[in-house]
Amino acid sequence: MLANDVVGLMARRGGGLGRIRIAVLVLSITAMLAACGERVQPPLSFALVPLPALPKEVIRLSVAHVVNPRLEKFSDAQLAVLLDAMRTASKVHLGREIEFDRVETFSIDEYFKVIPASRQAWRNSMIYDFKKGKGDRVKLEDAYGLAIDQQTVPARDWAAFAAREIGLEKVDTDRTAWKIRFADVHLQRLALLANLKAADGKPVIDQTPHNEWMFWNSLGEREHTHDVIITNQLVASAEYGAVDIHSALRGGLTSGTTAFAPQARFGTQLWWSTFAFTSNDPVIVEMRGGEKYEPAEAAWLAGIGAAHELGHLLFQYGHPFGVPACVMSPTPMLRFREQSRKLDAGACVAAQSPSMKPGVLRIIRPVYAADLKR
């Protein structure tokens, strides 16, 4: 089976930001890594994560706070506000009551060190290495071509959404033109993000893999995991797959993702970054449309945004481009305040978007040889 049919569906990049599809063959990945002499543990196949059977009672979810000590993080009080906002948004926009277990805190290195390096290696071949300037532009464009093909809304809807964010006056749906545009804006804006500085004066995006979306995609490989992971890490990168169009508009910045997690209660987990809510770097503020947040508002908006990922996790909803009333509608750039004011549960239902049907989002998990021996 082709990886562009399956691997890329391992996750939904949200914020309400989404990311799906990896445009490479599984055998090609294995051969590439073998040629490099790397020890890898590539998947034998891929399996569809079923739509979860939700309990009738209140849904309880475990929570981890994964912290990069170099970056500003939410306080305990802000985390409480964030989780309260998620509870509220879930009840209003998803129709389910949720509660959270006590938050457990980990350093980013501590949380990821238990993931086998061999299971990270096959993902590394899919990373566009913008740090060393060794990316393959054609492969990136092809990844966007695949993302365009697999949208679940009419082309005019996603094209209009994207055109507004790049200043394109005339909206067209030409696939070739758009895959080039998406690659252009992705790399141009990622270059701006690469220049962000942390409080210590050093680049936020350093030589660690902490910023790489593929690094975060490996979370589901943990033997013991959490349903909800909150982090202060900036995740901004480029890949040869798992791309989605609204992430391109932000230069590959991803606020959150819902992905496979066999050990999690419902077979998936979500992670959500608070970086875009705490940073006041001019690049981030511009992406927020000039929005600046006090700590309490930042936490509340972060929770409303994270509820988007709950929709992926609980119902496997897609992205209803063109219906901003839906909590599942991708947030334009990072304008979370603007987006929150447009939410209207009744109007979302009335719109009857095909992306709001349970199970429309296909999430795939890798299957390894070791899994078959259990």
Tell me the role of every PLM-derived stretch.
Residues 34-35:
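C-terminal motif of bacterial Sec signal peptides marking the signal peptidase cleavage site
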Residues 40-249:
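Propeptide-to-catalytic entry region of secreted or membrane-anchored zinc metalloproteases
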Residues 1-19:
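N-terminal secretory signal peptides that target proteins for export/translocation
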Residues 19-26:
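Sec-dependent signal peptide recognition
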Residues 277-374:
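The catalytic-center signature of Zn2+-dependent metalloproteases
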Residues 241-298:
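Active-site scaffold of zinc-dependent metalloenzymes
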Residues 45-56, 68, 182, 272-273, ...:
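Phospho-regulatory, Ser/Thr- and acidic-rich intrinsically disordered linkers and terminal tails
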